[in-house]
């Protein structure tokens, strides 16, 4: 048996009861980072211990939704938890994507408990040079 020597054990128990695990109707938020690398936005979500098959990524119009579920380890009917500090349940995060992003080309990778999405900037939104002509010449946009 594992012994806890934390003097705030009762506070921990009360906090866990008040912040119950997320459910599909009321999921818990997951931590994330977002940055831009050249012409791609990179969004990383911390999902340690989540089976990749339990991760759902949906894009509807410009709304990106990530949902994941982490259940208890092992066979629950034969396991008696002594210490349960890792969060369980459903985790979710929604992001509103700009119209300038190419939602058809989103890539998702899951490695070492981190889900990484790569969202490229749409070609139509990339910087272009406008050629200026003189007199009867016309202006032409080039990529």
Curated annotation (Swiss-Prot):
Species annotation: Streptomyces albus G
Keyword Oxidoreductase among record annotations: no
Descriptive protein name: 18 kDa heat shock protein
Alphabetized UniProt keyword annotations: Stress response
SUPFAM superfamilies reported in the protein's UniProt record: HSP20-like chaperones
UniProt cross-references to InterPro entries, sorted A to Z: A-crystallin/Hsp20_dom (IPR002068), HSP20-like_chaperone (IPR008978), Small_HSP (IPR031107)
UniProt cross-references to Gene3D superfamilies, sorted A to Z: 2.60.40.790
Family according to the record: Belongs to the small heat shock protein (HSP20) family.
Domain sHSP: 23-135
Pfam families assigned to the protein according to its UniProt record, in alphabetical order: HSP20 (PF00011)
Gene: hsp18
Conditions for induction: By heat shock.
């Amino acid at each position: 048996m594992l012994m806890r020597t934390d003097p705030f054990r009762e506070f921990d128990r009360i906090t866990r009861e008040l912040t119950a695990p997320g459910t599909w109707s009321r999921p818990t938020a997951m931590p994330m980072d977002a940055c831009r690398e050249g012409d791609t936005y990179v969004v990383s979500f911390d999902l340690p211990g989540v089976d990749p098959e339990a991760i759902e990524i949906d894009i509807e119009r410009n709304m990106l939704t990530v949902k994941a579920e982490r259940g208890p380890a092992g066979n629950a009917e034969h396991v008696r938890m002594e210490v349960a500090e890792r969060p369980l349940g459903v985790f979710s995060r929604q992001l509103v994507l700009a119209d300038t992003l190419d939602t058809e080309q989103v890539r998702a990778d899951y490695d070492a408990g981190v889900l990484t999405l790569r969202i490229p900037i749409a070609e139509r939104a990339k910087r272009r040079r406008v050629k200026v002509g003189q007199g009867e010449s016309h202006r032409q946009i080039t990529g």
